[in-house]
Every structure is written in structure tokens, then in C-alpha cells.
Swiss-Prot record:
Location in or out of the cell: Secreted
An example molecular function term from Gene Ontology annotations: neuropeptide hormone activity
Species per Swiss-Prot/TrEMBL record: Oncorhynchus mykiss (Rainbow trout)
Protein name: Pro-opiomelanocortin B
Modifications after synthesis and translation: Specific enzymatic cleavages at paired basic residues yield the different active peptides. Acetylation of beta-endorphin occurs in a tissue-specific manner.
Family: Belongs to the POMC family.
GO cellular component labels: extracellular region
Tissue and organ expression note: Pituitary and hypothalamus of adult diploid animals.
Biological process (GO), any one: neuropeptide signaling pathway
Length: 240
């Protein structure tokens, strides 16, 4: 695409430059006296620099202007001028027409630029594995297990197992998710009515033995032997 654009620009530049070059050639052909007389003389030959060449041309121009021109009729001058103007106008108009007319007009014929060399040019879906057809199965006419390759059979069996497992998991999830609404409502009401007990924690409902770290036992579990012995001692002292 970029190459075609450069070609179009170069063609346009050539079309524009051609008429101007033609105009310069016409001017030089109409007035050949200056360059011819300058380069024919011995003064302008073998000049070392461009400045001296320009000075030489300037001197010869001034000399030509001082000389009296040859007598020409008005008809000849008018015909020469009309010819030169006609050539210049024809060249300029042809250049303008070439600029206006596009060499490759924008139409539907131009192909759309498809970015096939990029990986996002043509997005491809899931890659489909090609199905391999073996000549032995075609020649035999039947697809028996002996002719079918072992690797392909293993792949098919693994794919079937995966599909069955995925379907089973989906069914189990669906069964666990489907819960009656009445049961959930009654469970929420029971929780609201009763006290919240942290049964899911280890310390939610500890046993009586392990309560308070096992150091403090309840009154019912304490032995009454020390109290009985104390009363016995008191009664014996009072009797004495």
C-alpha cells in the first residue's frame, strides 16, 4: 500500500515538472545568442570558478543589449510570441489536467488491506483437530478395532471419560444447590427464637470436666470427707 502511494506521488511530480522543463527549453531555443556567443569566445573558456563564468555571461548580455538589434517586422515578432505563448499554455494546461485526473481513481476495485500477517488479522476460534483417514480402513470397507489405531481409541475413550465426569459433576452441583425453601425458612426461624450457641467451635459447649481448665470442680462432684472429719474433731474437743 505504501509502495503504491510513493509511485502515485512520483508520477504526479513527473507530470508537473515536464511542462516547466519544456518551457525552459523553449526559452533557451528562442534566445540562443547569449550562451552561443559566450562559450564560443576564448575569454569564457577554461575559467577556474563559477563566479568568473557568471561575470562573463553578464558582460556578453550587456554587450548584446548595447548592440542594435536586427530590423524585424511586427508580423514576425507577433507570430514568434504567439507560438511561444501557445507552447507554454499547452504545456501548463496538460500538466493541470494530469494533476486533476488521478491515475488510479478511488473505486471499489481497490482491494481492502487485510492484515493477515498479524496474529489478530483473522481471529480463529477453537482449533479443530483434523480427522485422519487411513487407507487401510477405506480399502477394507469396515472400521474394525484391528484397523483403527490404538492411540486414536485411547484418545476417544479419554474424551468420553472426561465428558461423563463433567456431566456428573454438574448434576451433583445442581442437586446440592436445589434445597427446599420451606426448610431454609424454618431453620432461620429456629435460630432467631433460640439462643445462639457456638457449636462449630471447640469451646462452644465444653464438657464439665474440662470446664475452667479442670482446676475448679463443681460442688456436686467435690468429696465431703474433709468436712466430716472437721465435725468429728470439733465434737471430740467439746466432749473433753
Amino acid at each position: 500500500m505504501f509502495g503504491t502511494f510513493l509511485q502515485n506521488q512520483s508520477v504526479r511530480l513527473n507530470m508537473v515538472c515536464a511542462p516547466w522543463l519544456l518551457a525552459v527549453v523553449v526559452v533557451c531555443v528562442c534566445n540562443p545568442g547569449v550562451e552561443g556567443q559566450c562559450w564560443d569566445s576564448s575569454h569564457c573558456k577554461d575559467l577556474p570558478s563559477e563566479d568568473k563564468i557568471l561575470e562573463c555571461i553578464h558582460l556578453f548580455r550587456s554587450g548584446l543589449q548595447d548592440e542594435s538589434p536586427e530590423p524585424r517586422s511586427a508580423a514576425q515578432q507577433s507570430t514568434e510570441e504567439s507560438l511561444s505563448l501557445g507552447i507554454l499554455l499547452a504545456a501548463l494546461t496538460s500538466g493541470e489536467r494530469a494533476l486533476d485526473a488521478d491515475p488510479e481513481p478511488h473505486s471499489d476495485k481497490r482491494h481492502s488491506y487485510s492484515m493477515e500477517h498479524f496474529r489478530w488479522g483473522k481471529p480463529i476460534g477453537h482449533k479443530r483437530r483434523p480427522i485422519k483417514v487411513y487407507a487401510s480402513s477405506l480399502e477394507g470397507g469396515d472400521s474394525s478395532e484391528g484397523t483403527f489405531p490404538l492411540q486414536a481409541r485411547r484418545q476417544l475413550s479419554s474424551w468420553e471419560d472426561e465428558m461423563v465426569g463433567a456431566l456428573g459433576n454438574q448434576g451433583a452441583k445442581a442437586q446440592t444447590k436445589v434445597v427446599p425453601r420451606t426448610l431454609t425458612v424454618t431453620g432461620l426461624q429456629d435460630k432467631k427464637d433460640g439462643s445462639y450457641r457456638m457449636g462449630h467451635f471447640r469451646w462452644g459447649s465444653p464438657t464439665a470436666i474440662k470446664r475452667y481448665g479442670g482446676f475448679m470442680k463443681p460442688y456436686t462432684q467435690q468429696s465431703h470427707k474433709p468436712l466430716i472429719t472437721l465435725l468429728k474433731h470439733v465434737t471430740l474437743k467439746n466432749e473433753q
